[in-house]
Design a protein with these regions (language model features):
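Helix-loop segments that flank and shape redox-cofactor active sites
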Residues: 20-28, 43-68, 131-145
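Short, contiguous alpha-helical
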Residues: 149-179
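Conserved alpha-helical segments that form or flank metal/cofactor-binding pockets of metalloenzymes
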Residues: 55-96, 167
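Acidic, low-complexity proline/glycine-rich segments
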Residues: 1-19
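A structural signal for well-ordered alpha-helices, especially hydrophobic packing surfaces
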Residues: 37, 44, 51, 70, ...
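Acidic/histidine-rich alpha-helical segments that form the ligand environment
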Residues: 82, 96-155
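Short amphipathic alpha-helical segments with heptad-repeat character
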Residues: 27-41, 67-70, 74, 119-122, ...
Length: 196
């Protein structure tokens, strides 16, 4: 028999946190980190999904490029979960919680060509990095340790984003995904460019 579905606990102020911060600040930082944990968990699953569903002439290059990114992003998730626990809160990593708390839709491509997936991943990485930068701004004053963690992760995410974009850039420095705001529109733009 399946477990009965229960309401998800709301994040509360922890009973303790790290020295030099109030429990209220610890709870607020933990909430910011939970959002980032959700995003990174979603990202590493999305990267693995693309790894399994990429097809076409660039298959092997993209397939092999993604596994190290999956591993690194999964490790980033672990660091954030452990920081949440260090702050006295309880990290939540269940699929239902992630889906309930996220502010974005599921990755929208299934089996598709390498270039289409790379175009869609450009949009995905842009969103994750923009939100990580916002989290840096929110955490810096009360918690420079968390800020440093997020800065280091942002640097690694930006490197991975460059790996993706290098496939989408022409010699003049123009991205095939310029002005695309959705995964599907980015995939469509890259498909048009790759057929020329």
């Amino acid at each position: 028999m399946a477990a009965k579905k229960t309401a998800q606990r709301k994040s509360t102020t922890p009973s303790y946190t790290v020295p030099g911060m109030t429990t209220k600040e610890g709870g607020e930082i933990a909430a910011v980190l939970q959002d980032r944990l959700n995003a990174l968990t979603d990202l590493h699953l999305t990267l693995k999904h693309v790894h399994w569903n990429v097809v076409g002439p660039q298959f092997i290059a993209v397939h092999e490029m993604l596994d190290p990114q999956v591993d690194a992003v999964r490790a980033m998730s672990d660091v954030l979960a452990e920081r949440i626990a260090t702050l006295g809160a309880s990290p939540v990593g269940t699929p239902g919680s992630l889906v309930a708390q996220r502010s974005w839709d599921d990755y929208s491509l299934g089996r598709a060509g390498a270039i289409e997936h790379l175009g869609a991943l450009d949009v995905v990485y842009t969103g994750v990095i923009e939100d990580h930068r916002e989290a840096i701004e929110k955490t810096g004053d009360p918690d420079p340790v968390t800020e440093d963690i997020l800065i280091a992760q942002s640097g690694q995410l930006e490197l991975f984003h460059w790996f993706i974009r290098a496939h989408l850039e022409d010699p003049g420095g123009h991205l095939a995904t310029a002005s695309a705001s959705t995964e599907r529109s980015a995939a469509a733009k890259t498909a048009r460019v790759s057929t020329r």
